[in-house]
Structures are given as C-alpha cells and as structure tokens.
C-alpha cells in the first residue's frame, strides 16, 4: 500500500527554494551550518531566522477548523498529500470506525475491528485461514532468533554443529535470566503468628496476675507471651506500663530466673535490638563468640543489618564496624565488616557470563594456585546476589568437579573457614544451616543454650517451620524430640511452645 507522494523520487525530496518558504527563511537545509561551541552561544539569537516564527504562526492558524494545510514540501510526481477531509481532522473518514474512548480498547486477544482479520493468539501462531508451516520451518510472524516451538518441559534442539548450552537447576540457556530460585522470604514460615482478637490490656492483666503475690504462674506467662507476635508483645509492654505504671521487663526479671528468664526476655526485645545485644555479648570480655557473629551477619537481610548498625550506634555510642575491628583481625575481620555493610546485591536476574567469570576467578584464587587469595572469595561471596551465587556454586561444581564448600575447607582454616562456609550454606539453604546449628547446640555433653535460644527466638516468625522440616530430613528425628530430651522445666516448655509442634 502506498500514499500519493510516497515514497520519494530518486535522490530524495529537493530542498525548498531559497526565500519565501512556507515557514519563512531561505529553505532547508541551510547552505552552511553554524559552528558548534560555547563561543557561538552568545550570537545564537542573531543566527536564528525570526521569519520562521511568523511563517509558522501564519500557517498553523490555517491548519485547524477545516482549512487546507499548505503544501510544505514539493510532492513527488503524481500528487501530494491527500486533501483534508470535510470537517477537518477532528472526524474520521466515513468508512473508518471512530477510535474508542480511553479505557475502551478491546482486551488482548479480543475481537479486532470490523472488517479486519482476527489476531494470532501468540507470536508465531498462524494467521486465521493460513495453514501451519512444515515441521522445522520458522512460523511466519515469530520473533526473530526464537527457537522452534516445543511442548512444555521440552528443550529445543540447537542447530546442527552447535553445542547445547549446559543447563543448571532452575536456569535456562540465555545469558541473562531470572532463575527459579525464590528470594529469601521473611515472615511467612514462622511458628508464631499474630494472635487473633488480640487485646494488649487484657494480656497485661494476665501477666500482672501471674506475677502478683506469692509465687509465679510460669505457665500463664508461657501461654501468653509464647503465642503473641513480636509486634503484639511490644504493645503489651506499653499497655502494662500504662495500666500499672510499672516496667514489665523489670517485673519479669525479678520473678523469673535461668534460661527460662533469658528466653522470655529474648522474646520481649524487637528482632533488631535482640541481635544488637547478642553481638555485644559475643564480643564482650576476653573471648569472642565468633560463631554468633558469623550466624547473625551471614543470615540477616540487608535491611535488618542496616537497622542493626543504626541501633548499635544508638545503644552503645560506638559503630558496629568499630566494635568488629576492636575484637577481630585479619581476613575474618574483613569478612565480618563486608557482611555488616548490608549491601549485598538483591537482584533476582542472573548473567551467566558473569557467573562463569566468577567461577574462574574463585578457582584461580583457590584450587588453581599455591596459597589462597582470600580477598577474591570475600569480594564475590559478600557482594553478589543470592540467585547469582547459587548459580556460581552449581557452575563451580560442574567445571571443577568439587563442591565449593570442600574447596573452602581445603583452602582456609579457623574462623575465616567457618565464616565463609556459613555464608555459602545460608545462600544455598538457610533453614538447613540453622538446623545444623541447632543440632550442634544440643549434641554431646552440655547444651549451648545461648545458641539454642537465639535461633529459636530469632527464627520463630520467619522460617522455623522450614527449619523443623530440614532438621527431620537431616537427622531423622524431630526438633521437638531433641529439645524435649535436652532441656527441662519451664525452659523446655517455652522452647517447645516456640517450636510449635512435633514432626
């Protein structure tokens, strides 16, 4: 289909004759262009043809209201632009349907305008009335470069002589893809959820009665605080002080003791403030609880870590980084400082070319050299996104035949080894990482109660259901069973309440 005057004659449209052009001035293009530069800006007003404006205004005034549009450019032989329809441009031609108003376009896949053929159902689908193309032939209208269509779950075969791109779990063969690895989810797999019909004043009264007079009703405290979300427990704190003019935390400290008291007080802190005091406790005194620092920094979200850093400065008038530097050293210190920035990439897209480059750099920094370039491991493991690093770990296994965790164990030692392993395990499977930590806390003689309390409380509203499932899968026994056998008294009762059930 063509229009009168289009396409242009050979050689293009001729320039307008000098002088008297419909827009004023001496035609276009000008015989010479002014030089470009700052020295030319001052004279710009003088270079601009003022007649353009007057000519434009004169012609625009006659454009609307049904007036004829001037022939701005010489037309090709055989005619110029078609004449303006009667009534101006405001109305469609008699044979044309009016454009539907805003919001009234037919939905995708709907019926086309009258007289038009129906649309294909998808890119590459045959036009109605046309036969399907032969097998192996690109359907007309398909997007260029697309592989031939296959059934769901079937991979298209590459052209002859081309090797298929290796596949990864949850990844396709494109260079930039969105993997099937879900981002870390928070707040939807916990054993403790917000209680329905919550009344903070009523709960404050229950707690007041439980601690009033001779003796303490520990079971009432367990039933109340063990079945409220953290947000609801903060409201109970405020309501208790409003109703009785007393600090609930001080009353709990005076009435409770031991690990039961520690667990209840942990429940009463906000998640961020709880971590702040756990970190402070880990670096206090002569020794350092490196495992606690690793666990917190390797498993928390960017947002949580940034809030933690601000809260630490508020509570102790010292930055979190200063606290880390004062109590750690070497590459382990650098690892913790990197993680404490809360600056990990949160993208869910994966660039496979970057994945392969990172794999090569990790291999060159460790297995493929004498000694280890720890800084390269630090840079990649602390900054790349979770989705990207899962792809890196899979590709590392494929290219080297060795799991990344085993390479870390071969190349590093001590706290740095444990820190790097924790990062990898959290990225691969966070619930499994915590299931292992819980099992180690209860394994053998004695119980690491701080670790047990910290994990049970901090994960109770996040992913404790998933941790329970991983624990059963990894150790053949339920978490509930092992807590029952390793603790006692009210301490056991509150932990089992948080656990939420037997598997």
Curated annotation (Swiss-Prot):
Pfam families assigned: Annexin
Principal place of residence: cytoplasm
A GO MF label: S100 protein binding
Annexin repeat boundaries on the chain: 198-269, 270-341, 353-425, 429-500
Protein family membership: Belongs to the annexin family.
Quaternary organization: Interacts with S100A6. Interacts with PDCD6 in a calcium-dependent manner. Interacts with KIF23 during cytokinesis.
Function per UniProt: Required for midbody formation and completion of the terminal phase of cytokinesis. Binds specifically to calcyclin in a calcium-dependent manner.
Protein's recorded name: Annexin A11
């Amino acid at each position: 289909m063509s229009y009168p005057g289009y396409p242009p004659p050979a050689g293009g449209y001729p320039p307008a004759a000098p002088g008297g052009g419909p827009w004023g001035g001496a035609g276009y293009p000008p015989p010479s262009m002014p030089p470009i530069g700052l020295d030319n800006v001052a004279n710009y007003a003088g270079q601009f043809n003022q007649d353009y404006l007057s000519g434009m205004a004169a012609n625009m005034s006659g454009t609307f209201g049904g007036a004829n549009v001037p022939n701005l450019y010489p037309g090709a032989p055989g005619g110029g632009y078609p004449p303006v329809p009667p009534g101006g441009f405001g109305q469609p031609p008699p044979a044309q349907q009016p454009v539907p108003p805003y919001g009234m376009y037919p939905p995708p896949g709907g019926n086309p305008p009258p007289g038009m053929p129906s649309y294909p159902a998808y890119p590459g689908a045959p036009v109605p009335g046309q036969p399907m193309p032969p097998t192996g032939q690109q359907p007309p209208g398909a997007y260029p470069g697309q592989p031939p269509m296959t059934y769901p779950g079937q991979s298209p075969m590459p052209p002859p002589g081309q090797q298929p791109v290796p596949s990864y779990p949850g990844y396709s063969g494109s260079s930039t893809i969105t993997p099937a690895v879900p981002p870390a989810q928070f707040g939807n797999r916990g054993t403790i959820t917000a209680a329905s019909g919550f009344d903070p004043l009523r709960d404050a009264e229950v707690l007041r009665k439980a601690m009033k007079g001779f003796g303490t009703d520990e079971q009432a405290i367990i039933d109340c605080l063990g079945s409220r979300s953290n947000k609801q427990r903060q409201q109970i704190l405020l309501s208790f002080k409003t109703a009785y003019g007393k600090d609930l935390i001080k009353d709990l400290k005076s009435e409770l003791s031991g690990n039961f008291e520690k667990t209840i007080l942990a429940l009463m802190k906000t998640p961020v403030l709880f971590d702040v005091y756990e970190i402070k406790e880990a670096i206090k005194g002569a020794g350092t609880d490196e495992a606690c620092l690793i666990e917190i920094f390797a498993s928390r979200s960017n947002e949580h870590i940034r809030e933690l850093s601000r809260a630490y400065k508020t509570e102790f008038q010292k930055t979190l980084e200063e606290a880390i530097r004062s109590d750690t050293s070497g590459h382990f210190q650098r690892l913790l400082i990197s993680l404490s920035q809360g600056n990990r990439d949160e993208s869910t897209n994966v660039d496979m070319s970057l994945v392969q480059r990172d794999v090569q750099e990790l291999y060159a920094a460790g297995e493929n050299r004498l000694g280890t370039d720890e800084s390269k491991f630090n840079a990649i493991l602390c900054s790349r996104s979770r989705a990207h690093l899962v792809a890196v770990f899979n590709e590392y296994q494929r290219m080297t035949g060795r799991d990344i965790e085993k390479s870390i164990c071969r190349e590093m030692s001590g706290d740095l080894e444990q820190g790097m392993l924790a990062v990898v395990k959290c990225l691969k499977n966070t619930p499994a990482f915590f299931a292992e930590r819980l099992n180690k806390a209860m394994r053998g003689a004695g119980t690491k109660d701080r670790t047990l309390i910290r994990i049970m409380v901090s994960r109770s509203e996040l992913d404790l259901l998933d941790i329970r499932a991983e624990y059963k899968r990894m150790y053949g026994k339920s978490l509930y069973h092992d807590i029952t056998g390793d603790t006692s008294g009210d301490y056991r009762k509150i932990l089992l309440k948080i656990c939420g059930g037997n598997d």
